[in-house]
Amino acid sequence: MRTLTLRRVARGVLVLVAVYGFWVFLQPLTIAGILNVGNAVGMGACVLLAGVVVAWPRVVRFVSALVKRRSGRLVVGVVAVIAVLGVVWCGVLSARMVGAMRAEPEEPATLIVLGCKVEGDRPSVALLRRVDTAADYLLAHPSVQVVVSGGQGADELISEAEAMRRALVDRGVAEDRILVEDRSTSTLENLTFSKEILAENGLGTSAIVVSEGYHMYRALRVADRVGLDAEGLAAPSAAWVLPTSWVREWFGITLDGLKG
């Protein structure tokens, strides 16, 4: 009886975890209309977990019947291996992402601020976090210049770079310290075109990339690929969007790796 009660409690706890997780991944959609692979996969995983827990006796019977056949054992084995490898892979990526997020620049260098969404002609909250991080660094290091990097989306009235330039000036950064790269549409283009601007202005290849922490590991990998000697300066992320962005980044890093 006690064992049965403990099992029910454990299943109840897991269902609550799944419901809470679903709510966490739903937040970006309800707050800002954000729906991407990060929260889609997150919500799907939570629904799957809840379904498996609720139907656990049936799941056990189904798997038990399946493993009685050779083909069934093969299917169960393959699914188990994929699941274990997936968990390990996500754990490895998360460890590397955390490491890149926590690292701080050792020496002053030109900043490259990576753009993100502009709402009309104003920076989004996420973009302002990057701008604030860059502004704090620039005001503390008066000799450092900055490249603001980001093109203009179809629903944006100005480029991400121009939005960042205006915001930096509003925060007391002199206009002659700001270089604008407003053609890019991806992290690869951000850093490729920014490197060209560094070369045009005789600023070498050393740089400090400013982005949100979850994105830093991938951004630095891309920077290395285009020939920049880069370090990272992580901006904070809003708690309600971080889990979604984190899961999305797993897919982004993996796809970048597959592309070489």
Question: Could you describe each region identified by the protein language model?
Answer:
Residues 88-246, 259:
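A structural signal for short, hydrophobic/glycine-enriched beta-strand patches
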